[in-house]
Design a protein with these regions (language model features):
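A generic "binding-loop/recognition-motif" signal
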Residues: 77, 85-86, 104, 120, ...
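A short, N-terminal "cap"/entry segment at the start of jelly-roll beta-barrel domains
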Residues: 1-70, 150, 159-171
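Conserved short histidine dyad/triad with adjacent acidic residue
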Residues: 64-84
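Glycine- and acidic-residue-biased ligand/ion/polar-headgroup-sensing regions
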Residues: 85-103
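Double-stranded beta-helix
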Residues: 127-171
Length: 171
């Protein structure tokens, strides 16, 4: 079976069709890093440089030295995640989605909990309305989202630390 993904005009809004990014669902092939980056660029180009994330419902959670980020991915939406600097927990709170990374591809569903390694970047297709939560260290114990994102998110693979780049095969 072929899974055809769509590229949204806004990350969680209307979309147009693009030929397969992933094949043979539910155990489709891993995506190449370059394919995921191209998909992300296409989304940005369609949205005038804007990723459309503000159209997805995003909730922030804070506990001492812990930051949780929860996003609602509407059924049928396709999104590309950020590159994270550190290992962190992922919790699929609700729904089902197909996920492709350079390390493998699989389906995630409500109740799944897993660790993302530093440098992981995902292309995600929400099969159902999906609530996805990531849990990150917040060593500064701040609620300043700009400061948290600077610590948590790498703007590019080149921005990862040397140790992290060895883990993802960049160094």
């Amino acid at each position: 079976m072929i899974l055809d993904m769509t590229i949204p005009v806004s990350a969680c809004g209307p979309s147009f069709h693009i030929q397969h990014v992933c094949t043979d669902a539910p155990s489709f092939k891993p995506a190449q890093r370059a394919d995921i980056v191209r998909l992300e660029k296409a989304i940005l180009d369609l949205n005038g440089g804007h990723d459309g994330a503000d159209q997805c419902h995003l909730t922030h959670h804070f506990a001492p030295k812990v930051y949780g980020r929860e996003i609602l991915l509407p059924a049928g939406s396709d999104v590309v995640g950020k590159i994270h600097r550190h290992a962190h927990l992922n919790v699929i709170v609700k729904g089902r989605a197909l996920v492709a990374t350079e390390f493998g591809s699989h389906e995630v569903k409500a109740g799944d909990i897993f660790v993302s390694e530093p440098g992981t970047k995902r292309a995600v297709h929400a099969i159902e309305d999906t609530v996805w939560m990531t849990i990150h260290p917040n060593e500064a114990d701040t609620q300043d989202l700009e400061q948290i994102e600077e610590y948590v998110i790498a703007p590019s693979y080149g921005a990862l630390s040397f140790e992290d780049t060895k883990k993802v095969g960049v160094a």
